[in-house]
Amino acid sequence: MSRVCELTGKAVLTGNNVSHANNKTKRRFLPNLCQVTLISDALNQRYRLRVSAAALRSVEHRGGLDAFLIKASENELSMRARLLRRQIVKKTAEAAAA
């Protein structure tokens, strides 16, 4: 399992630990990933995604998974999230036409 957020693309960063004596040692900054189940209102289904805590806050702030994915750019999303986004856009377009 890769350490990348499925919704924002947040991944592992590298840097240095810097001591008081200014000694530098390599380290990794890992994203705060959580396995969560999010509900799509348009599709009436639950989806299990691996997202960062910041992405989870963004989903809540935008009003749910559907609103977040519609506003998100496709190049940040994982392949699963892109497919889900296309399905949501298609379903909302059908609902608007009906």
Swiss-Prot record:
GO biological processes: translation
InterPro entries per the UniProt record, alphabetical: Ribosomal_bL28, Ribosomal_bL28/bL31-like_sf, Ribosomal_bL28_bact-type, Ribosomal_bL28_sf
Give me the Gene Ontology terms describing cellular component. cytosolic large ribosomal subunit
Q: Which Pfam family, any one of them, does this sequence belong to?
A: Ribosomal_L28
Q: Which GO terms describe its molecular function?
A: structural constituent of ribosome
SUPFAM superfamilies, from UniProt?
A: L28p-like
Q: Which domain of life is it from?
A: Bacteria
| Keywords, alphabetical | Ribonucleoprotein, Ribosomal protein
Please state which protein family the record places this protein in. Belongs to the bacterial ribosomal protein bL28 family.
Task: Read off the PANTHER family from this record.
Answer: 39S RIBOSOMAL PROTEIN L28, MITOCHONDRIAL, LARGE RIBOSOMAL SUBUNIT PROTEIN BL28M
Q: What is this protein called?
A: Large ribosomal subunit protein bL28
Species: Rhizobium etli (strain ATCC 51251 / DSM 11541 / JCM 21823 / NBRC 15573 / CFN 42)
Upper classification of the organism: Bacteria, Pseudomonadati, Pseudomonadota, Alphaproteobacteria, Hyphomicrobiales
What's the gene? rpmB
